[in-house]
Amino acid sequence: MRWKRTIQLLDVHAEGEIGRVAIGGVPKIPGETIAAQLHWLNTDPKGDELRRFLCLEPRGAPIGSVNLLLPARHPDADAAFIILQPDQAHASSGSNSICVTTALLESGIVEMQEPETIVTLETAAGLVKATATCRDGRCEKVKLTMVPSFVHELDVEIDTPHWGKIKADLCYGGIFYALVDVGQINLTIEKANAAGLVQAGMILKELINRDIKVVHPEIPAISGVAYVMFRDTEADGTVRTCTTMWPGRADRSPCGTGNSANLATLHARGKAKVGDVFTSKSIIGSEFEVGLQAVTEVAGRPAVIPTITGRGFTFGLTQVALDPFDPHPGGFALTDVWGPSAGEI
């Protein structure tokens, strides 16, 4: 076979959300830090080419992410990674951290210790401590100690053409979120409403990023609202979530970074304290356990240290390749399955 590029992927999902892990063939990514490498992936044409190669058709699909395993730069880290999605490279993700931890341990890249293995992951947002419960050569569950999460602004009013004025909390949980109580758009979080939730999320994200600028005070490479997450609280205190992702799909997992951001809002409103633990449920009914481990500060702002616990499952091993005569090395996306914003890719 006349392939000019090959990348090996271990297929993993965390509570339903696919996070393929590139375990071989990853090209060298320029940059002295993981944040600098993230910036390169999002600004250099060669970085864009790599993302499109892996994430778009015919090699990719509108669901899931591809995680690039990279050499760690921090002396305390076991591995580093950056998340690639159809829109751009992202700094941090709870479900993808679970996928990466599961892949590292079950592939033997990091030696598994039973009954517990601690893996320190380096991301552009900082270090994530992953505590994996292991038995009989399998990673049964992963508890993540997430990066400090904080509120940018609560109850931001947004003028919308469909729902009038709605309020959103703009918060950081590893990336920036707009958190919206789902009742404001007259929907509930359930499978049958996935398309409507996604459409609303895409509209709101565009409106927010058009009018409001958010930048991490210590990591300028992380800026802009990445996702809109709809939320609701069930009678037993379970937080129901649906994170909407460009160009038009719903996160299948409860969303680790989104729940981290939401935990910051709960703490800011006096609804969560250190030691509290609650359940978050996704649109497909899968669950994360969310805890408030500690409080801290980020650039003088109150912040929380969340924990996210969930499960990862391997389901395949793939080798992605490029034939030198392939007319679509940069991939493509169509609105039939990629959503109404696919034409912007």
Curated annotation (Swiss-Prot):
The keyword Nucleus is annotated on this UniProt entry? no
Question: For this protein, what reaction is catalysed?
Answer: trans-4-hydroxy-L-proline = cis-4-hydroxy-D-proline
Q: What is its EC number?
A: 5.1.1.8
InterPro entries from the UniProt entry: Pro_racemase_fam
UniProt-annotated binding residues for substrate: 85, 94-95, 251, 256-257
UniProt keyword list: Isomerase
Q: Where is the active site?
A: 93 (proton acceptor), 255 (proton donor)
Which leading EC class covers this enzyme?
isomerase
Please indicate if the UniProt record lists Isomerase as a keyword: yes
Q: Which Gene3D superfamilies match?
A: Diaminopimelate Epimerase, Chain A, domain 1
This entry's Gene Ontology molecular function terms read:
4-hydroxyproline epimerase activity; trans-L-3-hydroxyproline dehydratase activity
Entry similarity comment:
Belongs to the proline racemase family.
Q: What does this protein do?
A: Catalyzes the epimerization of trans-4-hydroxy-L-proline (t4LHyp) to cis-4-hydroxy-D-proline (c4DHyp). May be involved in a degradation pathway of t4LHyp. Can also catalyze the epimerization of trans-3-hydroxy-L-proline (t3LHyp) to cis-3-hydroxy-D-proline (c3DHyp) in vitro, albeit with 2-fold lower efficiency. Displays no proline racemase activity.
State the protein's name.
Answer: 4-hydroxyproline 2-epimerase
Species name: Rhizobium etli (strain ATCC 51251 / DSM 11541 / JCM 21823 / NBRC 15573 / CFN 42)
